[in-house]
């Protein structure tokens, strides 16, 4: 028989965080997301990362996206990028993006179909 999913059931399955922990104890997400036309994609991406327990979330994007996301989610760290084609991120921003510290790299939501910055351009140092 399938158990009834109640608030009590859900809370009983969420791991407890140690008292002596801090946001740096729970990973750092770097989201390369959004463009002038797709601001909501970046916002939903950041919100999802924060809600699922990421300690620090940094959004690398263009200014219109950063402004929209920071107004809604002030706990998000920002990595301003130069605008490129179609309101997306310019490849000139790649060095700045790669300097960010992260344990998880998320690329793509809202970059657009003509995005000059893609996974093939970005790797995280090990």
Task: Identify the function of each model-found stretch.
Residues 1-122:
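Small-residue (G/A/S/T)-rich helix-start motifs and N-terminal tracts that mark the onset
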């Amino acid at each position: 028989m399938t158990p009834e999913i109640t608030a009590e059931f859900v809370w009983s399955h969420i791991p407890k965080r140690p008292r002596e922990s801090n946001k740096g104890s729970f990973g750092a997400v770097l989201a390369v997301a959004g463009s002038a036309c797709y601001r909501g994609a970046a916002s939903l991406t950041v919100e999802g990362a924060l809600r699922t327990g990421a300690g620090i979330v940094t959004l690398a994007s263009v200014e219109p996206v950063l402004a929209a996301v920071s107004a809604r989610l002030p706990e998000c760290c920002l990595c301003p990028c130069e605008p490129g084609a179609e309101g997306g991120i310019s490849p000139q921003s790649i060095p700045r993006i790669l300097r960010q510290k992260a344990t998880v790299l998320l690329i793509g939501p809202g970059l657009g179909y003509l995005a000059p910055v893609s996974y093939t351009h970005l790797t995280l140092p090990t």
